[in-house]
Amino acid sequence: MNEPSACSGPPVKSKSSKNEPFYTLKALLPPYSEIQGNHDLLMSYELGPVEGGFSGSRRVKEKISSFLPHIIGEFHLDATKEASSLRALIEKPPIHKEISNLTSSSMQGFKLSAGPVDERYRHLFERRKEEPNLAYSEKLNLIRVRQQYDAYGFDDDETEKGFPKKHKKKKKDKKRKKEKEELGDAEKRKRAADEPMEF
């Protein structure tokens, strides 16, 4: 029995891509094939009638909404029936008159007048008295939720919350004092080195 050798297979090309004349252009032309670019594969495999059934002039019975069941409402609209085309918007604009400014008498309807708050909106302003967690701002005329005060900080983890803030402050003060002393000693040594030695 002839066992297949480890190097069996198609011969490996020793030509590198550097020897090719241009990028993606090989020295040899591709081999001749009966199937060319202008060859109709649908007709050769007798699939012409199947393709004509999908893309022919026959009207499709199903609407777009049948393929998109998750969209609510009727969105299969005909532009010719609804007259919602761009040409109809240009030829027949919806505004036929000139836009004019409102008169002073017409603007009186938009003017705010001082008076008691309507009963429908009175509960918005009475909420701040009932709930202590709400803070009212007169400047901005709004009600915002006041955050609960935490003596140990909002972002501290549980291990840090076990120690009071005073303990942390003492540690920081000691550290700063030690750093100042070290800086003072370093300055003294520098001055002593810069001074000329007397004999």
Swiss-Prot record:
Residues 179-199 have a biased composition (Basic and acidic residues). Residues 164-178 have a biased composition (Basic residues). The keyword Isomerase does not apply. It is found in: Nucleus. Component of the Mediator complex, a coactivator involved in the regulated transcription of nearly all RNA polymerase II-dependent genes. Mediator functions as a bridge to convey information from gene-specific regulatory proteins to the basal RNA polymerase II transcription machinery. Mediator is recruited to promoters by direct interactions with regulatory proteins and serves as a scaffold for the assembly of a functional preinitiation complex with RNA polymerase II and the general transcription factors. Belongs to the Mediator complex subunit 19 family. This is Mediator of RNA polymerase II transcription subunit 19. It comes from Caenorhabditis elegans.
